Amino acid sequence: KGTNRMKYLVVSDNHGNREVLETLFNHYRQSVDVMIHCGDSELSAQDSLWERVEKVTGNCDYDNGYPKTLTIETPLDRIFVTHGHLYDVRFGLQTLSFKAAEEQADLVLFGHTHQIACEQVGPTLFLNPGSIEQPRGSIQEQSYCIIESTTEAFHVQYYRKDFTVISDLAFTFPKP
């Protein structure tokens, strides 16, 4: 595999439903480069499910084995991952964008609000995959996201938990 293309699976806020994650990770294990969970799994940090999954803690995770934030370096991107509650994401992206700049992140992944969100602020793409269990807000879909990163752009596609495409939730964000 060349490094001019990377695929990231992003999921968040399954709130105790282990089976939905197991199904998802098994489905994508062979086809994506990095699997990322943005917190509120409510599972043990030692769970065998987490093998090959990058993960952070959420406000409902009481196992202190999870990091609060992660910075992942791939051949194409610098990815900052956090749940979002520590950066007041319910009130906008300002606090998180300061942290993103500090981390020199190309891509910021977060959860917490249970709402699908995808926005480029300056050179950085901020993305919330929504909740795979308990969607909130105007888009009532139990969702996750696949990001295909190339040297030119981020290609974002949201999916339902049964692996079907949410067709109007496909976006391309050019890289600077």
Provide a role label for each language-model segment.
Residues 4-5, 22-23, 74, 103, ...:
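Binuclear metal-dependent phosphoesterase catalytic core
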